[in-house]
Amino acid sequence: MATMISNLPRDLMEEILSRVPLKSMRAVRLTCKNWHTLSITISESLAKMYISKTTRESREGESTIITLMNYKLCLTSLVVDVDPYIEHKGKLTCFNLEHQVKISQVFYYEDDTITTRLVVWNPYWGQTRQIKTRYSHHAFSGRDSTYMFNYSLGYENKNSCRSHKLLRFIDYHWNYRGLHQFFWYEIYDFDSDLWTTLDVTPHWFIVISQSGVSLKGNTYWCARKRSGGYSDHIICFDFTRERFGPLLPLPFSFIDRHHSCVILSCVSEEKLAVLFQYKDHYYKNVVEIWITAKLEAEMVSWSKFLRINTGPIIHTSFFINEEKKVAIGFNDNRKTINIIGEAGYFRELDLGEHAEPYRRRHVFSYVPSSVQIKETAPGNIKKHQSSIETRLFDRNMLRLVAFEKKVSE
């Protein structure tokens, strides 16, 4: 009597799944309900074994990257060699969302991505979790105004398990003299399914034109003192303590540096990297990249990774390949990525698609992980906000309405 593939023993199905290439996992999940369920509930140890096996079998110098262009996320293989090249693996699709969405902002966190619709998505497992915000708000677009929601995903360790949280904040200021400003920091807990207002009075400005960088469960941003000056610091949000740390200095000076730009990245989920780009006295582009030698809650030290004179411009985001000692990031022509390295090494690779003007572009190295997104259990009784939190929320909403009225006058 023939055995249907959906009725195979679990251990045999797990063995089969462990041999499926990552790019074919989505097709396997769509085969039948049993395969889809098993691919999601499969043990973390097996998932770790599979990911480790895939990593070992990668070609030398190969990196898997995700790019955000024209509201789409695409998975690409980049091989850095004497003659580097790219292989397009396809568009990343949230096939378990009711409708496909345009992606305008991405925060990368150890294999999870989050968009401004507040969908947390793990491409490896094919899991998503939609998070309901407490209010909907559109940006005020006025003279000398700067505004954007900022999001970051992190965790604290509870009983050897990761308890995930989502930070969302507004730091809304009208003109840089600080005459009118509004800020509101709140955090969402995946376990309780509740939002909580945080007691934060920032003495800094976070560079909101860039996404934060996740490292070991916490998030880092480029920042500057609220009193003014350059964006010559980083700041960390600790998801365990639910608070910001002190401003930590970057390893370079902005004095006599024209048209400067600072971009933050991470290295192998172990260190931070920062790219400093500026024009020298001869108006030639200079790129410096530094990596953290030591990073603690209240101190940081840096080591220089790379310096390139008259190098090409890198926009928005970047990542590095430590082994090959190169940096990879978007060109300003909106359709190619630059690879820069020592001794004037430079290669330009065409992505095959031109990015639309004024749309966000993002590139980052992608490493699958066994972390799964905790779902809200069906039939759970919804917890209610405390009366104190309700009053804080109502007060902040009144402050926001009053602030926007003042700015629009």
Swiss-Prot record:
PROSITE patterns: FBOX (PS50181). Transmembrane segments: none annotated. Residues 2-49 form the F-box domain. Disulfide bonds: none annotated. Keywords: Kelch repeat, Repeat. It comes from the Eukaryota. The keyword Repeat applies. Gene3D superfamilies: 1.20.1280.50. Kelch repeats lie at residues 169-218, 221-266. PANTHER family: F-BOX ASSOCIATED UBIQUITINATION EFFECTOR FAMILY PROTEIN, OS09G0372900 PROTEIN-RELATED. NCBIfam families: F_box_assoc_1 (TIGR01640). This is F-box/kelch-repeat protein At1g48625.
